[in-house]
């Protein structure tokens, strides 16, 4: 099935379920990549108390979609429901006329997330997952001051004209669009932090900002124009460092030492044990292992010690990646990185060759 549509296995617990089970109210805002509408794995069935965003992956690749999805007990929802964007559907979903749509999903999702933070009373702990998609293609957004700034800055820009087979709509001033989307996301993050401070939650809240992959090239995106990803080789869908190494920024006044750069190697499956440790969930593996399953996927290691500036951090023996669509596999052990393409191995010493140019296999 399409990536992001296949449901999470309901026999295996996921992080929001653990947090909810341990007294947290949970919210998620953005793209849900754990199951299609009506499947066994939608936000309402997986430990999420409040949800607003995309469950349909097709709509998730449009910023002026036909509909979004919502699950809100406070609004009387019994399950995930569709919220039709009435203004948008008055105009075509693709091609000429799409630019007349006005309901910009990224702004709508972000405002709902801010309202959710604002609704917290400070008595019950909260766990929020904000899966914003900016600056993923398609590269379109409102004609506001953010976009106008970059249109004036990039006087020689390019248009990306959508081919007939693409899911993405045409992007005019594609460089300006991409830069403005990054700035828009930065603005969102600033507003989230400001809301936490306004509510008095900033001294007792951990915020992590990260990404799911390296830069993409579709829909008019031009990573070469923007310096690619600095000294790293590769892009999204590749197992070179540029495809799998991503920004990871932690903010938590009084908890996370400020201004520290750390080279600890981690993967997203380390988030579950880390959050469990910080939330005081004891022996989560024993608690949440399914006795009816031969295998449970608790592969992570808590990096709470690294986050809080303490000694004794446990490290992975290795990290592993694969991407079946490009027939690429990679394994990293310390500074050694093996990348396999179509079965042929390539070996790099990242301590001397972070761009992965010198194959010593």
Predicted regions and their residues:
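Short, surface-exposed beta-strand/loop micro-motifs that present aromatic residues
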Residues: 16, 116-118, 327-339, 346-347
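Active-site segment of extracytoplasmic enzymes that catalyze sulfate/phosphate-ester chemistry
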Residues: 1-28, 37-38, 43-50, 60, ...
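Short active-site alpha-helical segment characteristic of glycosyltransferases
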Residues: 15, 31, 271, 303
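Short glycine-biased active-site loop of nucleotidyltransferases that positions the nucleotide triphosphate
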Residues: 40-44, 311-312, 329-330
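Residue-level marker for buried hydrophobic side chains located in beta-strands
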Residues: 28, 207-209, 346
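Short Gly/Pro-enriched turn/cap motifs at secondary-structure boundaries
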Residues: 5-8, 236-241, 310, 319-322, ...
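Active-site-proximal cap/lid insertion segments
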Residues: 34, 38, 55-272, 276-297, ...
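Basic phosphate/pyrophosphate-binding loop/patch that engages nucleotide-derived ligands
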Residues: 20-23, 308-314
């Amino acid at each position: 099935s399409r990536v992001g549509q296949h449901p999470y296995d309901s026999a295996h617990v996921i992080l929001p379920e653990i947090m909810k089970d341990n007294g947290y109210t949970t919210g998620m805002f953005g793209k849900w990549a754990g199951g299609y509408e009506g499947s066994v794995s939608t936000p309402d069935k997986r430990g999420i108390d409040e949800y607003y965003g995309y469950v349909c992956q097709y709509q998730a690749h449009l910023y002026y979609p036909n509909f979004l999805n919502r699950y809100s007990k406070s609004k009387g929802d019994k399950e995930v429901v569709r919220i039709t964007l009435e203004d948008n559907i008055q105009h075509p979903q693709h091609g000429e006329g799409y630019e007349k749509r006005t309901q910009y999903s990224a702004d709508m999702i972000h405002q709902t997330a801010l309202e959710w933070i604002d609704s917290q009373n400070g008595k019950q702990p909260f766990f929020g997952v904000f899966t914003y998609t900016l600056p993923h293609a398609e590269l379109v957004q409102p004609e506001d001051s953010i976009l106008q700034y970059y249109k004036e800055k990039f006087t020689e820009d390019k248009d990306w004209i959508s081919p007939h087979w693409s899911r993405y709509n045409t992007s005019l001033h594609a460089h300006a669009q991409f830069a403005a989307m990054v700035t828009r996301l930065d603005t969102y993050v600033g507003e989230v932090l400001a809301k936490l401070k306004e509510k008095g939650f900033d001294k007792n809240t951990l915020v992590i900002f990260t990404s799911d992959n390296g830069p993409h090239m579709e829909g008019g995106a031009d990573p070469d124009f923007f310096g690619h990803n600095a000294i790293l080789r590769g892009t999204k869908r590749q197992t070179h460092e540029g495809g799998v190494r991503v920004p990871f920024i932690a903010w938590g006044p009084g908890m996370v030492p400020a201004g520290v750069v750390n080279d600890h190697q981690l993967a997203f499956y380390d988030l579950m044990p880390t959050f469990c440790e910080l939330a005081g969930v004891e022996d989560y593996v024993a608690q949440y292992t399914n006795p009816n399953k031969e295998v449970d996927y608790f592969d992570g290691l808590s990096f709470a010690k690294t986050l809080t500036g303490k000694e004794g951090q446990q490290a992975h023996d290795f990290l592993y990646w694969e991407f079946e669509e490009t027939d690429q596999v990679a394994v990293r052990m310390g500074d050694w990185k093996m990348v396999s393409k179509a079965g042929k191995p390539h070996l790099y010493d990242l301590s001397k060759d972070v761009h992965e140019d010198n194959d010593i296999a």
